[in-house]
């Protein structure tokens, strides 16, 4: 199976493709991520609350927030910006030793960038609607590629509430 749900209240969770290559992520990484997400959501109220970090061998190397509204460009998703920054910092085309963590399941556009960047582990805190995220790629698509990341959904109330409040405010604004 390519997608796993992991309880966020556990003390630690492990993400691994092989027994000999385990990336251990503890609650500190998740806690720091959620604190930063909450801070950014209050600062950037016009943007969808999508926040992404990339870790290279367990070290934070890149973090970005959505800039779609700020730049008036639909390609400025946090995942794509974060991947660009990470590649620049590491001076590489592929992010093979990296883990991407993001507040919302990557959309199909971001999924393409993740696949082409060969990021082996993708963690997201809120699933996308059916058919709109990386986990909805077809079996044919997955097996036609020589690479596909492991996907982990770790649902959190903070991420869920950030998106709920964002869309509640948006609906009021346009009604």
Tell where the protein language model's regions lie, with residue ranges.
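Zinc-dependent deaminase
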Residues: 1-47, 106, 112-175
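Short beta-strand scaffold segments in enzyme catalytic cores
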Residues: 49-56
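Short beta->alpha transition motifs characteristic of CBS
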Residues: 61-68
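A short, polar/charged loop-to-alpha-helix boundary motif
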Residues: 68-81
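A contiguous binding-surface segment within folded domains or other stable secondary-structure elements
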Residues: 83-95
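Immediate flanking context of iron-sulfur cluster ligation sites
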Residues: 92-104
């Amino acid at each position: 199976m390519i997608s796993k749900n992991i309880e966020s209240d556990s003390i630690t969770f492990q993400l691994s493709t092989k027994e000999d290559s385990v990336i251990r992520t503890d609650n500190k990484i998740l806690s720091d991520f959620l604190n930063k997400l909450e801070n950014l959501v209050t600062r950037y109220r016009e943007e969808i609350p999508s926040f992404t970090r990339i870790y290279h061998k367990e070290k934070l190397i890149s973090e970005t927030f959505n800039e779609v509204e700020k730049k008036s460009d639909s390609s400025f998703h946090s995942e794509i910006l974060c991947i660009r920054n990470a590649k620049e910092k590491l001076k590489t085309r592929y992010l093979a030793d990296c883990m991407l963590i993001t507040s919302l399941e990557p959309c199909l556009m971001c999924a393409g960038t993740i696949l082409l960047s060969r990021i082996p582990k993708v963690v997201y805190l809120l699933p996308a609607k059916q058919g709109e995220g990386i986990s909805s790629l077809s079996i044919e698509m997955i097996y036609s590629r020589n690479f596909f990341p492991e996907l982990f959904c770790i649902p959190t109330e903070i991420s869920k509430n950030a998106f709920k409040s964002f869309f509640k405010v948006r609906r009021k604004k346009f009604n």
